From Swiss-Prot:
The keyword Electron transport does not apply. The lineage of its organism: Bacteria, Bacillati, Cyanobacteriota, Cyanophyceae, Synechococcales. This is Circadian clock protein KaiB3. Keywords: Biological rhythms. Disulfide bonds: none annotated. It comes from the Bacteria. The keyword Protease does not apply. PANTHER family: CIRCADIAN CLOCK PROTEIN KAIB2, KAIB-LIKE PROTEIN 1. CDD domains: KaiB_like (cd02978).
Amino acid sequence: MDMNRIVLRLYITGNSVRSQQAIANIYRICQEDLGDQYNVEIIDVLEQPQRAEEEKIMVTPTLIKQLPPPLQRIIGDMSNTEKVLLGLDIVPEGLQVRLPED
């Protein structure tokens, strides 16, 4: 696997509106900001409860960035692109990060 590739796991509960919104938001963010450098795995905790238990998922939706390290989690609303990217410690290519001046 490409070392620059971002590996995400999105834990959802069934086919609820909230689950569908989380899926749509994550794919939108990835397509707009990560190009083709991502892989998203969708895990329904109703169908795969053991996976949720292994990752200690208590609330859905939960998004986990598996790779690259460090592992990061976001829980709940994922509609704000900037908050999601910052929460996952991801800086998209071409984004100009301004550091505060002394």
